[in-house]
């Protein structure tokens, strides 16, 4: 289905952010390494020549992880930040996998309309506003082959749950590792509630089902980062 451009959070992924993105996130390497390890496992039984859609591909981390493990796979990566794509293209070229990749500037609507064995979207969905989240998931669903896989990780949590204050303190510790300022830490609650489109796990799973996926299966959690996988029904 054709959807209007999603309402996203303000674009902070400029050239300065793109150049510093991987360095800034290196403090979270244990989390990202585990996430990518599990990503490779949950997609391990795809065809040897699988075609993978990477939504919000950024600097190409998931392509680098999957391309090394599965040398017959090809990738289409889409991202609204030209600066992030430029960094990603350079990394993929250095890793000698760029010839297996097509990188597109834009949103999921700008990706080829069908034929993917799997779609991957890591730490992207929470940048999509609540009112556009179903359309986002539906666009991904419609680009998969019947039975195709969707794997996603996003910031997710019930912000009104009694345990949320404790969850927030843990999340602040993550932000400190990434260089957060005292001012940004003080605003973190508001950022999660208003600047980002953070949904509860139950809301996310319900939207996946509404988009046409089978039952979402949780496969990853690190504080407020949660990952699910499901198949197109």
Which stretches of residues belong to each language-model region?
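Conserved alpha-helix/loop element of class I SAM-dependent methyltransferases that forms part
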Residues: 30-48
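A short acidic, Gly/Pro-enriched loop at the edge of an enzyme's catalytic core
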Residues: 109-119
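A short SAM/SAH-binding and catalytic strip from SAM-dependent methyltransferases
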Residues: 117-132
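Conserved beta-strand signature within the Rossmann-like core of class I S-adenosyl-L-methionine
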Residues: 147-155
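Class I SAM-dependent methyltransferase Rossmann-like catalytic core
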Residues: 6-10, 15-32
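C-terminal alpha-helical "lid/dimerization" subdomain adjacent to the S-adenosyl-L-methionine
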Residues: 155-210
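Class I SAM-dependent methyltransferase SAM/SAH-binding core
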Residues: 53, 59-109
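A short glycine-rich, Lys/Arg-flanked "PGG" loop and its adjoining helix->strand segment in the class I
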Residues: 134-146
């Amino acid at each position: 289905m054709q959807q209007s451009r999603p309402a996203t959070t303000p674009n902070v992924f400029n050239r300065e952010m793109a150049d510093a993105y991987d360095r800034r996130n290196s403090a979270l390497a244990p989390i990202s390494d585990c996430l990518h390890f599990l990503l490779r496992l949950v997609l391990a039984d795809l065809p040897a020549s699988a075609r993978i859609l990477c939504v919000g591909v950024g600097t190409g981390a998931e392509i680098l992880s999957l391309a090394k493990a599965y040398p017959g796979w090809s990738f289409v990566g889409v991202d609204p930040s030209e600066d992030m794509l430029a960094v990603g293209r350079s990394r993929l070229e250095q890793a000698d996998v760029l010839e297996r990749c097509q990188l597109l500037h834009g949103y999921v609507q700008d990706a080829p309309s069908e034929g993917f064995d799997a779609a991957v979207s890591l730490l992207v969905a929470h940048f999509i506003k609540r009112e556009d989240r179903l359309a986002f998931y539906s666009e991904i669903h419609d680009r998969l082959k019947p039975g195709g896989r969707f794997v996603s990780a996003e910031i997710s949590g019930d912000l009104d749950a009694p345990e949320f204050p404790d969850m927030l303190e843990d999340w602040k510790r993550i932000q400190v590792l990434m260089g957060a300022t005292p001012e940004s830490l003080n605003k973190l609650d508001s950022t999660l509630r208003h600047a980002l489109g953070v949904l509860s796990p139950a809301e996310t799973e319900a939207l996946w089902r509404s988009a046409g996926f089978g039952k979402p299966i949780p496969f990853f959690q690190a504080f407020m980062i949660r990952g699910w996988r499901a198949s197109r029904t």
